[in-house]
């Protein structure tokens, strides 16, 4: 990624995410040169909070804001943001979920008139009484939760990218009381910029605390955000499900990172890079030069799958479609895509399994037998006993395996085999290969299980969902 122009750099930053380690490495030279990243981050956060309040018709001077502040730099970002908001008239209470607070941020917040509520009896925060009883600790925790529940805005600055994974202790209890405990958020899908109009609004500082920063997993309590203000570069959890569902609208604050030498961990498919994969037609093209796609899809029970898959194939600029399936599907395909050709023949790519049940009728059995026979040509031998036929498998045309064909997949296949399961289908495929996993496990850690499926089968994995991996 050397030699990025600023336009290209910004394009990458909008469509790609970098690991927490890479972000730290990109921050380092800026910090060494005295760039005030924390002040930049906090100013952006305060600006977003003020805008959200304005959009909801709440004057900053009449607003109640609760900051959930951790001990590290993420808490410092939150404290400096809270300082700016308090300085402009907001009533802000900082709830310390750890034993310490960022020193400079805490001092500035107190000078601005901010209030502080300590939850840990063993805290070591200057000027704040500690050593209170367990009973009082419980009362303070309940008071903090009630304050947050009645606030206009909650600012989540508990951990940021300093902790990846489940929250524990006081932070975990607070998140569990105010948010969700280990499940995917049940939220209405609203157009960008729209709000439910319900308080409190939640602003996450950099990332929502408690989500898997680098893998997007949700394994414990967290507070779903309405807006996440992230700094320097997107983190994987902002793009990967299920954590991506907890981030709300994402605002990226550009720190002018030098991204040369850093490979994105996650990339979003954009119109531009999708277009790069499409072969443009040539003046002298014939239908065979443009390529032929073969489809074994649909069934008597799901004939629509045959029609949809053939119509989709016809939109991809290919030269010809060959379709194989039961009579009811053949009739419907020809009605919808009259240029389709029925029956066997040479193809340059295959799509199989969509709408094919697991042998509910004799026609289904015939289709499954046809698919199984095709898939044998893609089977690789074991690493311990390589076979000359492996070269032939690698030379086979690209193949998409979906739905009813997934259970017919050989043990190991070359990477031009693309499997397209949803969570339940992937769980079944993995279970058949000895993994102890169900659909909910896949939904909670989709990246982990998609990678595991690739490791076990060798196939390219496209795990379908609201966000597809």
Stretches with model-predicted labels:
Residues 102, 126, 212, 330-331, ...:
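Generic structural signal for helix capping and beta-alpha/helix-loop junctions
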Residues 1-98, 225-227, 236-403, 407-418, ...:
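Small-residue (G/A/S/T)-rich helix-start motifs and N-terminal tracts that mark the onset
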Residues 121, 130-140, 209-213, 274-279, ...:
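Short gly/ser/thr-rich secondary-structure transition/capping motifs
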Residues 124-125, 161-163, 358-360, 407:
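Short, small-residue-enriched loops and turns at beta-alpha junctions
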Residues 146-147, 221, 453:
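Structural alpha-helical scaffold elements that stabilize or flank donor/cofactor-binding regions
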Residues 47-160, 166-205, 369, 378-382, ...:
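Nucleotide and nucleotide-moiety/phosphate-recognizing core
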Residues 152-153, 158-267:
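Internal gly/pro-rich beta-alpha loop/helix module
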